[in-house]
């Protein structure tokens, strides 16, 4: 898996595109929970997801039609 960087344009395995705003956010005082903040290119909505979940592999049993190996993959590096 290619490392995700701030500013990257990523594609979700379901086909939507997102801009990564931050890969170094933390929840409150718990600095062990790293978060990714990202913005929908379609709606402008802001989303936050734990880094490990953001970088996880697609469940091919649940989504056998998915072409991507990972939940999010780099579409364009800015």
Please place each PLM-identified region on the residue numbering.
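Mixed-charge, low-complexity intrinsically disordered regions
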Residues: 1-78
């Amino acid at each position: 898996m290619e490392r995700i960087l701030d500013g990257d344009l990523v594609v979700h395995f379901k086909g939507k595109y997102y801009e990564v705003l931050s890969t170094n956010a933390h929840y409150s005082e718990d600095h062990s929970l790293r978060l990714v903040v990202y913005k929908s290119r379609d709606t402008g909505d802001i989303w936050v997801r734990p880094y490990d979940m953001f970088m996880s592999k697609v469940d091919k049993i649940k989504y056998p039609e998915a072409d991507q190996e990972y939940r999010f993959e780099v579409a364009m590096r800015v």
